[in-house]
Amino acid sequence: MEEIKMDRIEDAIADFKEGKFVIVVDDEDRENEGDLIIAAEKITPEKVNFMLKHARGVLCAPITVSRCKELDLPHQVSDNTSVLGTPFTVTIDKLEGCSTGVSASDRAATIQALADPASTPATFGRPGHINPLYAQEKGVLRRAGHTEATIDMARLAGLYPAGALMEIMSDDGTMARLPELRAMADEHGLKLISIHDLIAYRLKQESIVEKGVEVNMPTEHGMFRLIPFRQKSNGLEHMAIFKGTWNEDEPILVRVHSSCATGDILGSHRCDCGEQLHKAMEMIEKEGKGVVVYLNQEGRGIGLMEKMKAYKLQEDGMDTVDANLCLGHLADERDYGVGAQILRELGVHKMKLLTNNPVKRVGLEAYGLEIVENVPVETVPNPYNERYLRTKKERMGHTLHFNK
């Protein structure tokens, strides 16, 4: 099959700055779809009409979390159970100068108002015909989605961080795939880029971690090396524990492990985190080379205080997923972008990933890392964590096995 040509990110940024559309595609393991994106301040009724005619999907308007708060745009639902956690807010229409809100001119006016610093909550009526979307603050380095790609493109182009996007559908109503997207881009003189390439571009342009000093680290599993890393955006400190040497094209064992004070330090039986960490280190010691990236992301990213609240809800009958959702969190709020950059700093590009979690694989692959094999880290359930592990298997898709 002929490889589909993608355009340079630099050329796409230049077009975006001029108010042209760009087509953005994501990973095959994610939505495997293309979106038509444009800067909010560059939208016109004619461009809205082009999107409705040629893309045919749902017209959405990505904006930043801070902008959502400024405009008092809450999440559309308190319990987001969509597959990819698409972060819709309540729908809106611009009030002044618009009629029903559904025409191309009304929709363009609403999107333009999102990029107008003078707009306030009173500028918009709710509900309406435009779907704003919360974009993660660190863009595609936090979440490899079209929403974040739109905001990143606006920022890279020096424009207001707001945009419009629409999924591209084929004439028969199915989602357009890469060959058709390339043909559409060529027909209309548009640039076609991938989120994968946008991530790689940002990682080359930006460093999100500061590397510390490397030291020896003797452990019960053998002699390792340790390097701390500080995340520049929030000061969080992470570490890489590794041994051996490798070539850039050599797949090595990698465990990306989120901190669990209760499991890793106290040996808690409520989870299997500590067991997975030690098993991973044993496997790396046996292999003679490999990396554990230890991320400071307690409680799947919600922190120790919130994790204890979730534990209390679990004691009252909820499972681990519903407890997070009840507290206003996603089921999993971890950021794999920082882990990906740490691995790149260590010269790791191909890996045999030590995980039971399919989301972790997708999260790392989105940042340009190649996973040649998933290596499960099986643990033995105990009476305190069996329900937790079953929830991870049944509701989060983890690869786990239980004795009948």
Curated annotation (Swiss-Prot):
GO BP term (any one): riboflavin biosynthetic process
Xref: InterPro entries: DHBP_synth_RibB-like_a/b_dom, DHBP_synthase_RibB, GTP_cyclohydro_II, RibA, RibA-like_sf, Riboflavin_synth_RibBA
Cellular component GO terms, alphabetical: cytosol
Binding annotation for Zn(2+): C260, C271, C273
EC number in record: 4.1.99.12, 3.5.4.25
Cofactor note: Binds 2 divalent metal cations per subunit. Magnesium or manganese. Binds 1 zinc ion per subunit.
NCBIfam families to which the protein is assigned, alphabetical: PRK00393.1, PRK09311.1, ribA, ribB
Protein's name in the database: Riboflavin biosynthesis protein RibBA
The organism of origin for this protein: Bacteroides thetaiotaomicron (strain ATCC 29148 / DSM 2079 / JCM 5827 / CCUG 10774 / NCTC 10582 / VPI-5482 / E50)
Gene: ribBA
